[in-house]
Amino acid sequence: FGGNRAVDGIGFTVAAGELLALIGPNGAGKSTTFNMVNGQLPADSGSIVLGGVELLGRKPREIWKLGVGRTFQIAETFASLTVLENVQMALLSADAKLYSMWRRAADHRRDDAMALLAQVGMQAQAERPCSVLAYGDVKRVELAIAMANAPKLLLMDEPTAGMAPKERNELMALTKQLVVDRGLAVLFTEHSMDVVFAYADRIIVLARGRLI
């Protein structure tokens, strides 16, 4: 950006069944790294490989279909839709070959959507609109949505931001269980060091675009 390298010469691996924390100050290059992995930003050089498949140069939706999921610092759901409909929409997107093929999600893979909600403890609230949920519950729904494409790698951008300590621990314990149950690889950024030390299997530190 502006002639400066936001990320320069970094290299690391994330194994299946592992939570890897990527930490560093604001502006260190964490978000840039995430955006290169999921195709939102191009890289000048290098390689990003998932299960033997090169991701660099691919479009974000193609990378998503190949098995890279993401959650965001501010949870993203359709507030006017129910919890169940949000997950059904994600499943419909995962199944559709073209956006123009989307149809109403009301009956789409209901059982699969309910199974995902059960994994995050939200099946009892399936018919509630997301607009009335507590924020901790919205984060659980977002996690279920992120599982819709059966990801091999999940990117979690400051997953516990804005959450109370009890909610933080519940969300990360739930994430840890998904890692175990699904053999999922998770790369997450986090500013709360208590969360990092409690839940990360490994920690890498980024500063000024370089690993230290």
What are these model-derived regions, one by one?
Residues F1-I212:
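Glycine-rich phosphate-binding loops of nucleotide-dependent enzymes
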